[in-house]
Amino acid sequence: MKNTQRNELAVCGFAAVKKLEKNHPEKIRRLYFTSDVAPKFGGLCKKLAKNHGIYNQKPAKDLEKLCGSVHHQGVVAMIESPAIEPLDFAMAEKWAKNGEHAVLLDRIGNANNFGAIVRSAAFFGIKNIVIPQDESQSSITTSSYRVAEGGMEYVSIYSVSS
């Protein structure tokens, strides 16, 4: 769920938040968790405290409100909403020159499907995903982040005009 007032995205799900902690802990603005998963996030809480980040233990119902889903698995991290950069010819040319692969998507409307594609791309070492600038295309959402199970930390997402 996006908090448009603060330009934030809720990242929920154990695997997604753990990969975020491992690869980009600096992205986490606030962390909320239930008592049963609290011991698994002690290290992250120390990092957040050191950098004046906020962490808080909350009941599961509060986490549902934060992320808009019952599928939070006891943890929600608030991050700045990721920007999707437009793809330019120079970038695509660089990929070709370096032998990098990309996944090109066309109107994957379901956020869960988009997240599963991101997860698969990350697993296979594909670092670039290109989506159309189209209202029917799913984007980076709380749901897609959760379903990607940490894959969002390994890919860059670009957009092209339809």
Give names to the regions the model predicted.
Residues 15, 26, 33, 94-162:
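RNA substrate-binding interface of SAM-dependent RNA methyltransferases
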Residues 1-93:
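N-terminal positively charged helical leader segments and presequences
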